[in-house]
Amino acid sequence: MQVGLAAIFFGFLATNVVFADDSEGWQFVQENGRTYYKKGDIKETDWRVIDGKTYYFDYNGEMVVGWQYIPMPVKGYTIGPYPNGIRLEGSPMPKWYYFDENGVLQEFVGWEELELKDSLTVGKKHGEGWEGPEVLKLAYYYFDQDHSLKTGWLYDQSNWYYLAKKGDSGNKNLGGERRVGWINDGSAWYYLDSETGIMQTGWKQLGNKWYYLRSSGAMATGWYQDGSTWYYLDNKNGDMKTGWQYLGNNWYYLRSSGAMATGWYQDGSTWYYLDNKNGDMKTGWQYLGNKWYYLRSSGAMTTGWYQDGSTWYYLNASNGDMKTGWFQVNGNWYYAYSSGALAVNTTVDGYYVNYNGEWIQ
């Protein structure tokens, strides 16, 4: 069969134009601004291969162009409109295909940059007049071996990509386009390179914030251990936290690198102790390195005189460790028991200390 196309374009066409004829009497005909493939009054519908090119004619026999959501023919099945809009068991599922301005199925396989699939470019018929946008929006799409459009996750040449699905969060288009930036596939957040669309993993700085993307690409939240170092990533937004953070009824300090601090930490002129394993800020009496320290409710290490109930203690002015035995402060001698409690109104080693604990010579 040889069927030639003449003067076909995506726009208005003259009516009742016979484009070509063949020995069986089939011909392309333009009627009422639409294009049909007819033999007498019989209009072809569904898929048709004409002169080696594939076309699709809808249930009215109108030839389609642009983006179309239609079933691909499967051997042994008759393709047509679903009764009452219901797909019969065993009939092929519809897929997305792209037809050029002449109605020819584009037998794409792999990546193609095409007009954006949206309400302006979907479901058009050959000869249908419409005014597209002044600036054509383009997007990258991926086509399978049967020339149908793929959606969802795609693994191609050692990289992962995400091809939008209709109804995806934050996506107003009809799906299939290669996404970039942040996307949520319904299970987790992912970041796709802003230019290539390749799924990112590992540490990633975006704007002024850091994020960690697991080997699966999923954005990490909450506590995350990298080697021997712990980090905290916002439980909702995933951005890495720094500075003081109150988490689960405990305070933590995260350095400018995001690494959780442990052990002694100096903030300005104040010292704090952060659990050597868990990193939570300690308060109250703490026995560290064979010495006692007192950390206030704020976590700040106490120095100098400290009263606990009716008992006084003296904590070294320079390093905060609790004094025991005889010690001197501002020219006065004092005695603290092994518990650290200051001796008052008593005699120690033959020396009398008054109600302030001062040795009276």
Descriptions of predicted regions:
Residues 1-361:
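Extracellular adhesion/carbohydrate-binding repeat motifs centered on closely spaced tryptophans
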